[in-house]
Structure formats: structure tokens, C-alpha cells
Amino acid sequence: MLASKAGQVLALLERSMSQSTMSQSTRLQSARSQQITQCSRLLPGLLFLVLMYHGAAVSGGRLDAQEVTAAEAVRALEALTVDTIARTEKSVVAIARVRKDASGQRRQATVDPLSPDFVPNEFATGVVVDKGGLVLTNYHVLGDISQNDYFVWIQRRPFTASVHRMEKVMAVDPWTDLAVLKVAATDLVPMPLGDSSLLKKGMVVIALGNPYGIARQGEVSASWGIVSNLARKAARRPRPVGGGSGAAESLHELGTLIQTDARLNLGTSGGALVNLRGQMIGLTSSLAALRGYEVSAGFAIPVDATFRRVLADLKAGRRPDFGFLGVQATELSRVDRQQGRRGALVEQVLPGTPAAAAGLRRGDVITRVNQQPVHDSDGLFREIGRQPALAEVALQVLREPLKKQIPRRFDLTATLSKKYVTAVAAELVQDHPVPWRGLQIEFSTALGVPDLAEQSQRIPLDRCVGVLSVVPQSPAWKAGLRAGDFILRVEDKKVDRPALFRRLVDSRQGPVELELANQRTVVIQAE
């Protein structure tokens, strides 16, 4: 009975947030104000919504005093909250980072980290994403893997938490600040994933974390609140002049984060933000607060389509890739914004990039990407940065005609290249390409060179591949190749993608001739 009422209340709450009107609120608020005051300490905001529709029609149905009283609503929501925490807390773990000294030994050597009595100095939270021992957390909590050991505490109620040494890092992604670790544990309970695209401000969420408590007592702590805001930006460092592929260090600096008033302490990075259906809709992160946001606000990485794609790659030990368009963009003028115009103003189109191939021009205003509205340049780079490399994107463009007439709106399609993402140590990715004769090849747009805009004026970026790295003293090194070189041809075959380059060189034995964009030709000897 209580469970059904809880579901009824939850459905009502969600409908009310999307369908309520000012007139209904005004009409009913006065009549229920005394009840709201009495219960607000238990369920702030929630009971108001229940009582607001107390006896009012909702989508053809009614919820009146005979069906759910105020006290029953409180008990139903309390039961729902307790049940949600009980179902999801078993999927939340603690992660300890133990520093090594100069000799490579752990500094905290007085107590064995595998002992239940060991409590680490540095800790974070993680979420189980596979019963075979895969744990998701934030990339930034790992620090320097060569300087630290890692241990994971898993809740084993009614016993104290079991502790496991991390076997390896499956893969990490600095762009989305996600990482997946592997521990030697089985029969874990994966966290169900929800859909953050369904979130609205005011929805109820529960934050699960407290790694110190998990490690000490085997217990997860819970706090609750509402979704305070959506698409918030993490503070960013100063942008390089001209923007470019390295303008933002993280996708979340462009406006993706969920903001909640649920209390998040330091150490809760990598914890779960769940809805009342027991689904994770965000991965909590303290990074935004550390970079200068208000302490009272909590932030979480949304569980959206990009999150799911990245998670699938990380679980498989792969680094995900992300799209690159090839424009420098800025905001519209203040006059345009005051007139209600929105979009990203294209300042420059880099030759040989997807933007040039699609037909974009300087002065164009991009207003949508794949039907998602674009309000400014951050919005443009956010939507492009969510896409995988080689994805086709639909761009809605506003173009000013030569003669001062009404701007023309039309659609373009671009096939994205690959953007540069901060390089990571080889041990942080299990499935990484094996260098060919010491040569690691990438998309020409994914090298991270600071002067890509200048190089695009003299190098055909759409008709070459780039040299990401060269192993010292390898055949490629001895031939004179270095990181940042661009390769046009393998023998007499043109190459424009790393996969094509690999197919061509793998089919050849003995010396292989490469033509470079700087008009050099080198010969790579067999190993």
C-alpha cells in the first residue's frame, strides 16, 4: 500500500513540475500553507507539490485527501527514499590513493592497506559499473599513477568493507573527466544508469558517497536535495589566444554539469547522484568547487548519451574520441544579443577542415547542432565536443547576404575530424595502438599543436595524417621523423586517416617510403 502510494506521489511530483501553472499555485498555496510549514523540514519543496495538487485534477486523474493525506505523503516519500538508498548504496565504493616515496615504497607503511584498520590520507569515491570488478570514478582523482598505489573498499554488509588492491586502470578520458579501474572482485552490484536528459530543475536527487565512512565502517553516507540548475560550467583556465582545439581542457568547462543543493564534501568525487527510481543520473565531482565555485553547491557529470558512449569505451580499455569542426568562433555583438539573437559567430574557417568542406564561411552564425540550440561559442564547441570523430552533424546556419537584406537560414552537414585531448601515460589505457616501426599516427587535427590555424594555411589537413609520437632510436626516428610532422603519402598512395595509413604500411615488407607535407621524403627501414 505504502509503496504504491510512493509511486503515485512520485508520478504526481514529476508531472506537477512540468505541468503546474501560476494560477493553480496561487489558488492552493494559501489553503495548504499551514500543512506545508509543518512538513517542510522533512521534505522541503516536495510536500508543497503534493499538497498543491491535493484535490486538483492532473492529466485526467485525481489525487485528493481521501487517497493521500499529508502524513501519508510524508511516509510514502520517506519509504521511497529509504528504498532507493538501500538499492543503490551497495554499488558505491571508496578509493584510496596511497603515495609512494622516492624508493617506490608506500609512505603509509605502518598499517597494511589491505587491513580493515587502514584509513588513507587521500580518498575518493567510485561507482561499480560491472559485476566483474569495474569501477567508475573521476579521472582527476587518480593523480600521477606512477607515484601512487590505489585500493578500493567495497561494502559487504553486515560485515566491514572488503578492501582490494587495484589491478589496473582500464582507460581514462581527461576530456570528460572519467576513468574506469579494475579490481579483483566478483559478484559486485552494478549501478543502474538513468537518463539525465529527462532532468528538470526542482527534481529530487540523492547523493551517495563519503569514502572515509565506507573505508572505516563499510557504510555509504547519503544526502538529498533537488536539481538546482543544469548545463553549468566548470571554471576554466585562461583560453589561448585564438581558441583552437586546446581552448578548453574539459567538456564540462563548456556547460554540462548538473548543480544540486545536496551536500557534497571533498572526497565525494566519483560518487553517485541518483533519482528516486534508483538510477544514477550523475557522477558527483568536487572539481568544480575546487576551481572556485560556491562551496554550498554540488556538481555532477550528467549521465547522457556522451557519458554512456565514453563509459563503454573505457570499460573496453579504449580511449574515446571526440569531434573537431575547424572553426574559430566568438559571441554575437551586444546589440544582436539585446535583439534576442543567439548563436556562435564564425570568425575563421580553417582550410582543410570539416568546416571548410561543409561550406561554412567567415561571418556565418551557427544556431543549431543536430537540432540542439546553440546560444554562444561555448555551446557550439560543447555540442561538437560531445560527438565522436567521423560523426556527421547537421548545422543550422544564418548567413548575412552581401546586400543588406534579411539573413538567410539554411542547413549544412559536416563530417567531423578528431579533436586533440590531453595525452595520458600508456599505463592508463589498456587497448592502445602499437607503434609501427616506432611511429604513432593520428588525425592531422588531433596533434595538439599550438599553431594549427597557422599550419592549416600551408598544410592540407584533409589530405594527410599527423605524427603523434616517435619512439627514440626506432626506425622512424632514425629516418628523421618527429612528432608534429604530417604525412601525405605511403609510397604512391594518399592517406587522410590513421586507419588507412595502418592498412597501407601493414601490407608492405621491407623499406617503406613516406612523403611528408614539408616536401621531404623519408624511407623507414624494417625493424
Named regions from a protein language model:
Residues G55-Q66:
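Signal peptide processing junction and immediate N-terminal pro/mature segment
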Residues P433-D462, V467-P475:
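Extracytoplasmic/periplasm-facing segments of secreted or lipoprotein envelope proteins
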Residues G363, G484:
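Conserved catalytic motifs of ABC-family nucleotide-binding domains
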Residues N518-A526:
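Short, low-complexity, Pro/Ser/Thr/Gly-rich segments in the mature regions of secreted, periplasmic
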Residues L43-A57:
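Bacterial N-terminal signal peptides
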